[in-house]
């Protein structure tokens, strides 16, 4: 979706380093906890919100409002439900710190994209990293490189220098695909052998 030079010659703001920043996770399942471990390695303070708290989460659980108010970075790692559609909205953005960073590698409809655009334009949101998009189905899974993007909301996002959009394939590495295949096969073998299912999802 967007080409980024490997080396961008400019003066970087060294006051925005991650150390001692508050990184807030919405969703503390396996992926959220892995991300928390990475952030902890950078010396970040890890806070989390999840209706189903995990004893394996190494950070501190807080309410959603407290998370929004304290966040330097908000990263979404939760499934999409009827209750959390547009979790990031004009209302929740208004509760955030000025300059907050938002990361979404989960589900596009967790974010009201127009509200995100408004927050970015006003400076309330400092930057966004998106591997998913609210209307991605008709845009992300075919090659439109020779066509004009008619989705004005997405076009606005892509044009912003403080936004990175990838087409729901940031995971697409040789190592990740191999791990997915191995885990899937092992899940089948464990199921049919009557073994413990380490990746079981209760519905």
Task: Spell out what each predicted region is.
Residues 1-25:
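N-terminal glycine-/charge-rich "phosphate-binding" loop or analogous flexible N-terminal tail
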Residues 5, 47, 109:
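Conserved beta-strand positions in the Rossmann-like core of class I SAM-dependent methyltransferases
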Residues 11-16, 53-57, 137-139:
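Short, charged/polar "capping" segments at the starts of alpha-helices
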Residues 99, 109-203:
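Rossmann-like dinucleotide-binding domain for NAD(H)/NADP(H)
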